[in-house]
């Protein structure tokens, strides 16, 4: 195996894959589009990855890891369940995690995960990490309900014609939390 000229090339390709998914949609992503966005020769695609499925798996695995770290960061100063409810509310209301780019990637991942078992596993692992974070303050069933609420309310918050106020979101979070 020859040495790679650019030690960051593999990571550039992974990041360009996510960019291609955002720009073109998952079904229009090609090796050529990714290589162009990454600024690498087309041959690099098959040098580092066995095919588009492996590339999508690596890209979405990277994306969900980053999202999990951002998710956990919202809870870094939380010491109790009421504090966790406040953090959940902040996460939804601030849209810091649910940026337009992140939301586009989430939509694409949801759509493809229903047809690709490996990507479904990526989704399941991501949900498990989120729920484990919440289980620091809530029992597993409540953590799962809160995680589902966060996903759904995040979608509603970024698409509603008139998003809810922070106080309205907090009341809903507290209801789900019990």
Curated annotation (Swiss-Prot):
The protein, known as: HTH-type transcriptional regulator RcdA
Gene3D superfamilies, A to Z: Tetracycline Repressor, domain 2
InterPro entries given in the database record: Homeodomain-like_sf (IPR009057), HTH_TetR (IPR001647), Tet_transcr_reg_TetR-rel_C_sf (IPR036271), TetR_C_31 (IPR041583)
Residue range(s) of DNA binding per entry: 30-49
Protein keywords: DNA-binding, Transcription, Transcription regulation
Induction: Autoregulated.
Chain's gene name: rcdA
Lineage: Bacteria, Pseudomonadati, Pseudomonadota, Gammaproteobacteria, Enterobacterales
Domain HTH tetR-type: 7-67
């Amino acid at each position: 195996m020859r040495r790679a000229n650019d030690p960051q090339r593999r990571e550039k390709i992974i990041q360009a894959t996510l960019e291609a998914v955002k720009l073109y949609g998952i079904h229009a992503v090609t090796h050529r589009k990714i290589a162009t966005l990454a600024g690498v020769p087309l041959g690099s695609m098959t040098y580092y990855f066995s095919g588009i499925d492996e590339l999508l798996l690596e890209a979405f695995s990277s994306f969900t890891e980053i999202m999990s770290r951002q998710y956990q960061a919202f809870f870094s100063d939380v010491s109790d369940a009421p504090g966790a409810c406040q953090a959940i509310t902040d996460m939804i209301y601030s849209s810091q995690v649910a940026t337009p780019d992140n939301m586009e990637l989430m939509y694409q991942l949801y759509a493809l995960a229903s047809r690709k078992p490996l990507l479904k596993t990526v989704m399941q692992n991501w949900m498990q990490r989120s729920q484990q974070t919440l289980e620091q303050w809530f029992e597993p069933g409540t953590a799962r309900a809160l995680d589902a609420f966060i996903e759904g309310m995040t979608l509603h918050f970024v698409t509603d014609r008139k998003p809810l106020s922070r106080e309205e979101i907090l009341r809903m979070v507290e209801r789900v939390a019990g």
